[in-house]
Design a protein with these regions (language model features):
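N-terminal metal-binding scaffold of metallo-dependent hydrolase/deaminase domains
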Residues: 1-45, 56
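Acidic, glycine-enriched loop/beta-strand segments at the rims
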Residues: 11-25, 279-280, 346-383
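Active-site gating loops and adjacent loop-to-helix segments of metal-dependent hydrolytic enzymes
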Residues: 73-105, 139-155, 159-160, 218-245, ...
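Alpha-helical scaffold segments that flank or form the walls of functional sites
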Residues: 75-141, 163-175, 422-431
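Metal-coordinating catalytic core of metallo-dependent amide/deamination hydrolases
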Residues: 131-252, 257
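His/Asp/Glu-enriched, well-ordered alpha-helical/loop segment
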Residues: 238-245, 287-372, 388-389
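C-terminal cap of metal-dependent C-N hydrolases
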Residues: 362-419
């Protein structure tokens, strides 16, 4: 299928400013962006269909670099709680009641929300084999999937079973080119050194990266210093974890040395600004990490703590929170936030041919309707995305040249069934 977006405003990479907007034609041939420029037809493109780009904005699809998709079931059910109370006293007891069907529909709900708000790829940490990966696969989104790994010692049978869950999903869904996999040790406070070493051995054996929660709370730092004699970042670095492609979620409580280590090792730091603020964990040192060259990307975390998976909200918040916290209007710019939410996020997930609008790259695209009072006059399209848009201006979403949503119509997912099943599940779990 050859699709032409005719005369559409596109957010394109720009060496000087990061991004610039240009009215142009964008041609998609099967799964790939084949042409960006003036008059694609005159330049030899033969479209099967042409989409009028007037009053529309097209950008690379957004990338959610940290979430727990199945936890969309827990939206608005664990609020105004401090982090450890939220996790251990509220979330984990509800997780114990989940069935495979619950997690399937919770994940479908997450995928539905992400599609409707312009996300085309995400990094997931989950708690079960098959049902979650199956739901993601059926959605059409791209995803890097990690089974959350908890264990004590190399011989922990439960810990070994969780590793096998990862390998099972890899074998079962390995033919789906939109899916990648990572090892997902949950955190240093739910694993010990022996188990982490086993996880790294398996990561090396299968050529996988690592997805881990890191330095999320003050308590995590204090406990690590007491137990390990150093920060969580230093502990994992000394262990050799950062020799792997690593995505470290949160990275809120970092020392200068920690930031230097992350920068030197090329670790992707997935900041979750809304979730971290809501759970009282504070603000990550984003301006300092940017200055040091840390690879920063943005995640929403789960709907159980955010309470949405809307990347527009987190792009907005990361800019505003750090401007206010640093008392500097230049602390984090809209263009920096958009890069975190697209290009850097895609690389964090291991998708090297997406995240920007560029010829030869995957046609993972988000199209917005800009005829809203809150967006007009647009003036600066990147600023409009970060400071004015809600996310529900998204009109169409394409992955590998396939529309997952077109003119706000979702393809291939039963919205009403998803809503019904998720509400039914929560009445049983927390009714």
């Amino acid at each position: 299928m050859n699709t032409l977006f005719k005369g559409i405003t596109a957010i394109l990479p720009d060496k000087e400013s990061g991004f610039s907007a240009k009215v142009c034609d964008i041609a998609v041939s099967d799964s790939v962006i084949s042409y960006i420029g003036d008059d694609a037809v005159k330049n030899g493109f033969v479209p099967d269909r042409t989409i009028d780009g007037r009053d529309k904005l097209i950008t690379a699809g957004l990338v959610n670099s940290h979430t727990h998709s199945y936890m969309s079931l827990f939206r608005n059910s664990a609020d105004d709680l401090m982090f450890h109370t939220w996790l251990f006293d509220r979330i984990m007891p509800m997780e114990d009641k989940l069935t495979a069907e619950d997690m399937y529909y919770g994940t479908q709900l997450a995928c539905l929300e992400m599609i409707k708000t312009g996300t085309t790829a995400f990094l997931d940490m989950n708690i079960a084999r098959d049902c979650i990966t199956r739901a993601i696969s059926e959605s059409g989104l791209k995803a890097t999937i990690s089974r959350g790994l908890v264990g004590n010692g190399r011989d922990d049978e439960g810990g070994k079973t969780r590793i096998e869950d990862t390998l099972y999903d890899m074998r079962t869904y390995g033919d789906n080119k939109r899916l990648k996999f990572m090892m997902g040790p949950h955190a240093i406070y739910t694993t010990d050194r022996g188990y982490l070493e086993l996880v790294m051995e398996k990561a090396a054996e299968y050529g996988l990266g690592i997805n881990i929660h890191l330095s999320e709370s003050v308590k995590e730092i204090e406990d690590s210093i007491t137990q390990n004699g150093c920060s969580p970042v230093k502990y994992l670095d000394d262990m050799g974890m950062f020799k792997f492609h690593t995505v470290a979620a949160h990275c809120v409580q970092l020392s200068d040395e920690d930031i230097d280590i992350l920068a030197e090792r090329g670790v992707y730091a997935a900041t979750n600004p809304i979730s971290n603020a809501k759970l009282g964990n504070g603000f990550a040192r984003i301006p300092d990490m940017l200055d040091k060259g840390v690879k920063l990307c943005i995640g929403t975390d789960s709907a159980g703590s955010n309470n949405t998976l809307n990347m527009f909200s987190d792009m907005n918040f990361i800019c505003l929170a750090h401007k206010g916290n640093c008392r500097s209007a230049t602390a984090v710019s809209a263009r920096q936030a958009l890069k975190m939410a697209t290009e850097t996020g895609a690389k964090a997930l291991g998708f090297d041919n997406t995240g920007i609008l560029k010829e030869g790259y995957a046609a993972d695209l988000t199209v917005m309707d800009m005829k809203y009072p809150s967006l007009q006059p647009v003036n600066d399209s990147v600023a409009a995305m970060c400071y004015s848009a809600s996310g529900y201006e998204v009109e169409s979403v394409m992955v590998d040249g396939e529309f997952l949503m077109e003119n706000r119509e979702i393809k291939g997912m039963d919205e009403e069934r998803i809503y019904f099943e998720c509400n039914k599940a929560m009445k049983r779990i927390d009714g």
